[in-house]
Amino acid sequence: MSTAKQNLSVQRWVAAISVLLLAVKFIAYYSTHSVAILTDALESIVNVAAGFIGLYSLFVAAKPRDQDHPYGHGKAEFLSAAIEGTLIGTAGLIIIYKAVQNLIHPVELHKINYGIWLIAVTACLNFIVGYFCLRTGKRNNSLALIASGKHLQTDTWSTVGIIIGLVLLYFTGYKWIDSTIAILFALYIIYTGYKILRTSIAGIMDEADVKLLSLLVEVLNTNRRENWVDLHNLRVIKYGTVLHVDCHLTVPWFLNVHEAHKEVDALGILIRKEFGESLELFVHSDGCLPFQCKICNKTDCPERKNNFEKRINWTLENISQNKKHELK
């Protein structure tokens, strides 16, 4: 099964289970009238909406690139995550509003022990599904699955906190505990929504992934070949599960086209080995210039004009510049 199809299959399960958990949580709310349980139920509405939005985005992202979308449809995942983050934040605000109302005008609570058991079951299911979703998303580089997994895990921990609060309420009878729990976890939900939204906007705006670039630079330095005289103008863009890498690779000027292409192929094989097969590599090969002899450690070079002095270590700062490197 391809990565895109696997992502789609997992998201189908997420959407289906979210509907089931939503029903269970609303049964618990109508049985107890607890605003803390309502907090959980409202977030489950977001889970359902986000699950189906994520499902659609993965369906779109799985489409092959076409004439209108030469880089594919991967950015649909970023849009999905942005909507999900917004929905999570909105749910948090609604929960705070409802909790404050209940602090001012308390309502009678019923069957708290019954509600505790129901939402405990949903917490267990959420944790299992969220863990599997997050693991698959990280393995397949799917932002939509990662967002869904984080969302479900957040829901799990908030449910656990709500259960603890409801147990205290059950034994003490203090009604204000119900609303206080709801407000605390609503703030946590809003924070989670912000983080998901921030990540998705970074993807939409093609913000540089510093962690990914740093790892790539480390891999290139460690596995540097003798004919890779220099590397510059390195850029990485991620569209869904596909990584697009482009750079300028300087090779000895006397290599023929076939030999230069072998060096480009070696670069592609190295990056795919470390980052997976979902990769598009665009490399512009440059011939070396006399001033670069000082940074070239090729031992059998027949055209050397200057003695080798020092190999320049590639860093995040110098490898991204559109400029050939030289010793000052």
What spans do the regions from the language model cover?
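Alpha-helical transmembrane segments and adjacent TM-loop junctions that form the membrane-embedded core
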Residues: S2-I17, V24, Y30-L42, V46-K328
